[in-house]
């Protein structure tokens, strides 16, 4: 019998100066960047927290604190890879991941496939195991006012 664990992650970043946002490991042209200590990939941060949460291993801030200068500007894909390596070492593997990106802008439809492909590559899995969806808050709240981006992520881990 296969054992399973479920993890949920959530992250938010405000817009800042810049000409693109990193989402799901993909640079997406935009009038702003995201304010963050690392590269600000809010999607990979939420996904990292979901993976860690499934095994009660804390959160991304515990493993890669923003008070540590070595993580300034860090590639969130590398952080996710390190986290997933520890998941594999613990005897688990990804069943599936489901991410919902919440923002008014930028428009993400043209980038969803690339995000799914990149996340699947980072997690050494099939693209069909990764879902990325985008939605808005109908111009309500901070995302609706175009002040930032939020992401929810859920993962299912299976014992190996």
Curated annotation (Swiss-Prot):
Give the positions of the site Transition state stabilizer: 37, 136
| Catalytic activity field | 4-CDP-2-C-methyl-D-erythritol 2-phosphate = 2-C-methyl-D-erythritol 2,4-cyclic diphosphate + CMP
List the CDD domains hit by this protein, alphabetically. Answer: MECDP_synthase (cd00554)
Residues that bind a divalent metal cation, according to the entry?
Answer: 11, 13, 45
Q: Which UniProt keywords apply?
A: Isoprene biosynthesis, Lyase, Metal-binding
Annotated pathway, please?
Isoprenoid biosynthesis; isopentenyl diphosphate biosynthesis via DXP pathway; isopentenyl diphosphate from 1-deoxy-D-xylulose 5-phosphate: step 4/6
Identify the domain of life: Bacteria
- Pfam families linked to this entry: YgbB
Q: Which InterPro entries match?
A: MECDP_synthase, MECDP_synthase_CS, MECDP_synthase_sf
Q: Name one GO molecular function term.
A: metal ion binding
This entry's comment on the bound cofactor is: Binds 1 divalent metal cation per subunit.
Per the record, the similarity remark reads:
Belongs to the IspF family.
Assembly, in brief, is:
Homotrimer.
Output this protein's name. 2-C-methyl-D-erythritol 2,4-cyclodiphosphate synthase
**The species this protein was found in:** Alcanivorax borkumensis (strain ATCC 700651 / DSM 11573 / NCIMB 13689 / SK2)
């Amino acid at each position: 019998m296969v054992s399973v664990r479920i993890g949920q992650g959530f992250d938010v970043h405000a817009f800042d100066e810049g000409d693109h946002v990193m989402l799901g490991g993909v640079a997406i042209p935009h009038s702003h960047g995201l304010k963050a200590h690392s590269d600000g990939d809010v999607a990979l941060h939420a996904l990292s927290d979901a993976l860690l949460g499934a095994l009660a291993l804390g959160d991304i801030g515990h493993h890669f604190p923003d008070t540590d200068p070595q993580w300034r500007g860090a590639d969130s894909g590398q952080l996710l890879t390190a986290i997933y390596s520890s998941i594999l070492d613990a005897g688990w593997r990804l069943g599936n991941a489901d991410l919902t990106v919440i923002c008014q802008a930028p428009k993400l439809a043209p980038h969803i496939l690339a995000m799914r492909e990149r996340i699947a590559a980072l997690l050494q899995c099939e693209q069909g195991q990764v879902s990325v969806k985008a939605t808005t808050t109908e111009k309500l709240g901070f995302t609706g006012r175009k002040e930032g981006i939020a992401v929810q992520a859920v993962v299912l881990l299976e014992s190996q």
